Amino acid sequence: MLSRRLLGLTSLTALATPFILRHAAAQEGRTALELINRTPAVSYFAEFIKNQGLQERFSTGQYGYFIPVDAAVERIPALQVDRYRSDKELGRQTVLNHVTDFTRPIAGWAGDGTSESIRVKTLAGRTVTINVSGMKLPTIGGHPITYMNYRVSNGMCHAIDGVLAL
């Protein structure tokens, strides 16, 4: 017997799916950079990309982009954010740490008790782990992946509630 909560979640998912798919399909003609620049909730990261001169990395190639939401950046101490802005190499490497070789969709919320860990390489040369486990939000580097699987012309974008620091 389905619990009321599971039944409600299933119904909500069924109702929302056409809207989500339409929105995701609309992104396919855009690059990751265009999507980031048009999304107010990731404006700090858009600023970091521009300040580091990394627009091309977000416009060409095929990558997985893990974009920190503004709320995550706001939780970082102000002095650290200033370091990202003033120390060009630290800022550049931190931004590139959010670009990975993982271009597949992330399957989350399986609900079957299974889990999967995938180690991915970033353009900063680091390795981070994506974890998908049962009914929990998937994570990357320990940070929740809050929005997943926005296909863009040059890869796949995901929003994360954290910053993948070096």
Name each model-derived stretch.
Residues 2, 6-9, 13-166:
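Mature, structured domains of secreted/extracytosolic soluble proteins
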